Amino acid sequence: MLPDVVTFWHGPLDALRMLCLKSQVAAGHKVTVYSFDSLAGLPDGVGNAEAEAILPHAFAERLRPSGPDGAWRDWTTLQFSDFFRMRLMARGEGLWLDADVLLQKPVEIDPGKPYFAWERPRQLGNSVLYLPSDNHAVVAFEELMEQEELTPPFPASSSCPAANRTSWRPPT
């Protein structure tokens, strides 16, 4: 199956991201960039959708470090996009590609199976991501976002004995 491609962007898009978005359209994918502000000059065939409808901007406040200016920092945007992509997976919106992923050919997936990119040997990344909406990780993220504290119930630090595993696997 040739999935729709979805991504999130905050701020102006540079030439590299524009080229990558063009490559995704040229590969035959329907591409949608979600943002809080309208994005000018998107390549032909790339749609722009309102991010607020997926995950409200107010959610970013839960990620913001305490600081005097309260401005978004790069890492706050990165963390927000991690939650945003999982919300897109929960809604079955399509294949997540970071805006700097260049495609040379279409990406075909089996919609019933997870799809990840390898960043390093033995380390999955989330720059290319597809998860069925009923996947355990998607369900866990949805539950996490409903909590007052954004503390995951799965291993995330070396203080947790299970964190020494090579990868976390959801219970079956």
Labelled PLM ranges:
Residues 39-83:
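Active-site-proximal specificity loops/subdomain of glycosyltransferases
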Residues 1-57, 133, 167-168:
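N-terminal anchoring/stem segment of glycosyltransferases
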Residues 77-124, 128-133:
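GT-A fold catalytic core of metal-dependent nucleotide-sugar glycosyltransferases
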Residues 134-140:
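Short helix-loop capping/hinge motifs at secondary-structure junctions, enriched
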Residues 18-22, 85-86, 104, 161-165:
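Short amphipathic alpha-helical segments and helix-helix/interface helices
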Residues 142-172:
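Catalytic core and acceptor-binding pocket of nucleotide-sugar-dependent glycosyltransferases
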Residues 10-17, 74-82, 152-158:
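Aromatic-acidic/polar surface patches that form glycan- and anion
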